[in-house]
Swiss-Prot record:
Catalyzes the synthesis of the hydroxymethylpyrimidine phosphate (HMP-P) moiety of thiamine from aminoimidazole ribotide (AIR) in a radical S-adenosyl-L-methionine (SAM)-dependent reaction. It holds the Pfam family ThiC-associated. [4Fe-4S] cluster binds at C572, C575, C580. Binds 1 [4Fe-4S] cluster per subunit. The cluster is coordinated with 3 cysteines and an exchangeable S-adenosyl-L-methionine. Homodimer. This is Phosphomethylpyrimidine synthase. It comes from Xanthomonas campestris pv. campestris (strain ATCC 33913 / DSM 3586 / NCPPB 528 / LMG 568 / P 25). Pathway: Cofactor biosynthesis; thiamine diphosphate biosynthesis. One of its GO terms (biological process) is thiamine biosynthetic process. Substrate binds at N230, M259, Y288, H324, S344, R345, G346, D385, G386, L387, R388, E424, Y451. Disulfide bonds: none annotated. GO terms for molecular function: 4 iron, 4 sulfur cluster binding; carbon-carbon lyase activity; zinc ion binding. Keywords: 4Fe-4S, Iron, Iron-sulfur, Lyase, Metal-binding, S-adenosyl-L-methionine, Thiamine biosynthesis, Zinc.
Length: 625
């Protein structure tokens, strides 16, 4: 074991309180599965009693999906230098189809391991990776197609249901019918349904055997809509400690997966620290690191360098790879008349390689070789859209859709190897063209999960692209996209800071939830109903705690009404005490109850009383004060 020197250890010894304190008004709970070591974490929002004025009943706690891992659990001991507990290690080992390696398989990984100059940044706890036994396939899709329900599948089913069976209040269970556009939305998610969806290719459960710390989650249009957050250092910004904190910050606010897009120094070591401390799946774009290995000269990339990079990252524990195998030589000329050309970093790297060699993309020609690597570690494909439109003028053009058709072809090839696969999508698309993207993806790619960046619905709002894209994200999520890649306010302008990450995640949590409401996902309206009930009953703290960002809600409220007494007030600063619509509604109800009449009759009687007062006072519209 290599002991990291003091500087990095000091930086990572303690995360800031802002990223580790419990979510206000919530506590961590664990839902027991069928075996002792299967406990599914959730966040339980503790609610206060309804005031006597409104009936005086207790409000039971509400369970919600939680991505924050142990970082918001005051009972958990966090040691970044040791990493998280290997939750899935026993599940992986007991299947008997993997074995620990005696040494790293990647030549680059071995070189880093023996380079003493890296001791200052190396993750201190060394662990040898596992790999599939000779001839074995260790993907969740392979198990699913053999009829096996794994512990990971049961974990996912429990997690997706969010203890909906505990909600018995008819007011909270009320839900509008949804429009799911042909999706097979279930009233209750069972482990068998999870297995069926993975076997069919309509969902993926990204869980590399070398990332046993991860809490199983699922991506598919028949499940809750997920969001991804991007982190990563660059040549000009941020170090390892900052990236680990950014990871924890991202999952605190709801990042279901995190992509490490690092392009600066110490990519390998940064990724080690991130994966060992991540309870959510980690994705990467391996071509970025491969390019670093040839000093940024795309034309010098080779299959051998890329293959070694895939194995290096798979043995670290990366759960899904963005692979731009659909950028074909014949599609590159189709981008020549675009307004913004090729905007994907990965797409431009592969296009440059194709043109430099006048050969077909080596990721395409070696695709089945890549599948062999993926199924030996259970890494999922995220087939990259290297020709996505970079402005709305280029949306839905021949280059974009040509690549999508090729991704459909590659999906079927990946499924032949039982490799889990999702498809990446645009980009910049005006609202009227969004559904065409979703419909074509479902048709071409056999309903494999769609994973989209937005799309941004207009190009005129630099600094606000978390909003322009959340509009498109909500729409395409409703139409069937399974995971939404967040966009921050800094998109097109610079690298996001911590506040930008939070703003981007919040915009996308809203979009994902709005999509689930529109699809009619079972129980998804419970939280809305609970918050609305709390709002009507002036339970201010409950309103804050039921929101996606309790801290921001309380901060805004307290800007104008900061005292504790204001948390009991039957008004807010918007309307004040005399014009609160909800207070007036309650006054009508009280009048009706006092006089033993219906609310409609109460309104009529109240109008008659006011009419009499008006006439008695002289029937003057304006009176001297």
């Amino acid at each position: 074991m290599n002991a990291a020197p003091t500087v990095l250890l000091q930086q990572t010894q303690t995360l800031s309180a802002a990223v580790t304190q419990p979510i206000p008004g919530s506590r961590k709970i664990f839902v027991q599965g069928s075996r002792a070591d299967l406990q599914v974490p959730m966040r339980e929002i503790v609610l206060t009693r309804t005031p006597t004025l409104f009936g005086g009943q207790d409000n039971p706690p509400l369970s919600v999906y939680d991505t924050s891992g142990p970082y918001t659990d005051p009972q958990a001991a966090i040691d970044l230098a040791a990493g998280l507990a290997p939750l899935r290690a026993d599940w992986i080992a007991e299947r008997g189809d993997t074995l620990p390696l005696e040494a790293l398989s990647s030549s680059f990984g071995r070189g880093r391991e023996h380079d003493a100059r890296l001791d200052a940044v190396r993750f201190p706890s060394r662990r040898l990776p596992r790999v599939a036994r000779s001839g074995a396939n260790v993907t969740q899709m392979h198990y699913a197609r053999r009829g096996i329900i794994t512990p990971e599948m049961e974990f996912v089913a429990i997690r997706e249901n969010q203890r909906l069976e505990a909600v018995t209040d008819a007011v909270l269970r009320k839900q509008h019918p949804g429009e799911a556009f042909g999706a097979a939305i279930q009233q209750r998610i069972t482990p068998e349904f999870v297995r069926e969806e993975i076997a069919r290719g309509r969902a993926i459960l990204p869980n590399n055997i070398n990332h046993p710390e991860s809490e199983p989650m699922i991506i598919g249009r028949n499940f809750l809509t997920k969001i991804n957050a991007n982190i990563g250092n660059s040549a000009v910004s941020s170090g390892i400690a900052e990236e680990v904190e950014k990871l924890v910050w991202s999952i605190r606010w709801g990042g279901d997966t995190v992509m490490d897009l690092s392009t600066g120094k110490h990519i390998h070591e940064t990724r080690d620290w991130i994966i060992r401390n991540s309870p959510v799946p980690i994705g990467t774009v391996p071509i970025y690191q491969a390019l670093e290995k040839v000093d940024g000269r795309a034309e010098e990339l080779t299959w051998e360098i890329f293959r070694d990079t895939l194995i290096e990252q798979a043995e670290q524990g990366v759960d899904y790879f963005t692979i731009h195998a659909g950028v074909l030589l014949r599609y590159v000329p189709l981008t020549a008349r675009r307004v913004t050309g090729i905007v994907s970093r990965g797409g431009s790297i592969l296009a440059k390689w194709c043109l430099a060699h006048h050969k077909e993309n080596f990721l395409y020609t070696h695709f089945e070789d890549i599948c062999e690597i993926m199924k030996a570690y259970d890494v999922a494909f995220s087939l990259g859209d290297g020709l996505r439109p970079g402005c709305i003028a280029d949306a839905n053009d021949a280059a974009q859709f040509g690549e999508l058709e090729t991704l459909g072809e590659l999906t079927k090839l990946a499924w032949k190897h039982d490799v889990q696969t999702m498809i990446e999508g645009p980009g910049h698309v005006p609202m009227q063209l969004i559904k065409e993207n979703m419909d074509k993806q479902l048709r071409e790619c056999g309903e494999a999960p769609f994973y989209t960046l937005g799309p941004l619905t207009t190009d005129i709002a630099p600094g606000y692209d978390h909003i322009t894209s959340a509009i498109g994200a909500a729409m395409i999520g409703w139409f069937g996209t399974a995971m939404l890649c967040y966009v921050t306010p800094k998109e097109h302008l610079g690298l996001p800071n911590r506040q930008d990450v939070r703003d981007g995640i919040m915009a996308y949590k809203i979009a994902a939830h709005a999509a689930d409401l529109a699809k009619g996902h079972p129980g998804v309206q419970v939280r809305d109903n609970a918050l609305s009930k709390a709002r009507f009953e002036f339970r201010w703290d409950d309103q804050f705690h039921l929101g996606l960002d309790p801290e921001k809600a309380k901060e805004f409220h307290d800007e104008t009404l900061p005292k504790d007494a204001h948390k009991l007030a039957h008004f807010c600063s918007m309307c004040g005490p005399h014009f609160c619509s909800m207070k007036i509604t309650q006054d009508v109800r009280d009048y009706a109850a006092e006089h033993g009449i219906s609310e409609d009759h109460a309104l009529e009687a109240g109008m008659q009383e006011k009419s009499g007062e008006f006439v008695a006072q002289g029937a003057q519209v304006y009176r001297a004060s």
